[in-house]
Amino acid sequence: VTSLAIPPDTDPVLDEPGLVEMLCYRAKKLNRAHVYPVGALTIGLKGQQLSEMAELVEAGCVAFSQANTPILDTRVLGRAMQYAATFGFRVWLQPIDPHLARGGVAHDGEVASRLGLPGIPASSEIIALFTYLQMARLTGARLHITRLSSADSLALIDQARADGVDVTCD
């Protein structure tokens, strides 16, 4: 491994410039891999108050994310995307509706059933993804969507790209 994107859900959360600077300093000192910190989109990943993205970029962050913690308040999500768009920062989001996904641990389907795992319905991903893409259309935010698991989600991504939304995915 030569490069690592470090998500913000560390302990402590990567929501302060000093923490990011320390992470970059330690990684450089070890000289084992290139480290690319992904800063917290909101303070403490709580989804309430925006982090100081400009300061976090100065400290070394390459993008912003909520890690596995969705922002439930779409007003906060919109403000975060608008702020990120103003500076050209990329926002990484995992599309999952926490209410529809409650109790699930894997994409709902044949494999989950065979393994006896409680499933997360595709609708959980699609509904959250639709919201994220609409907010990106409205704000001009650059998105990276993580951990997609359904063909319908890929179709939404393709349509958004055709409409001019700057979105990548994995």
Predicted regions and their residues:
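Active-site neighborhood of phospho(di)ester-bond hydrolases with catalytic His/Asp-centered motifs
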Residues: 2-8, 37-39, 65, 146
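Short, glycine/serine-rich, charged loops/turns that create anion-binding
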Residues: 10-11, 42, 68, 96
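Short, intrinsically disordered, charge-balanced linker/junction segments flanking boundaries
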Residues: 2-3, 168-170
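Generic hydrophobic, aliphatic-rich segments that mediate packing or membrane embedding
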Residues: 19, 23, 31, 49-52, ...
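Active-site mouth loops of central-metabolism enzymes
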Residues: 7-10, 36-49, 115-123
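Acidic-histidine catalytic/liganding microenvironments
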Residues: 30-32, 164
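Histidine/acidic residue-rich metal-binding segments in metalloenzymes
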Residues: 50-169
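Metal-associated gating/positioning segment near the N- to mid-region
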Residues: 1-30
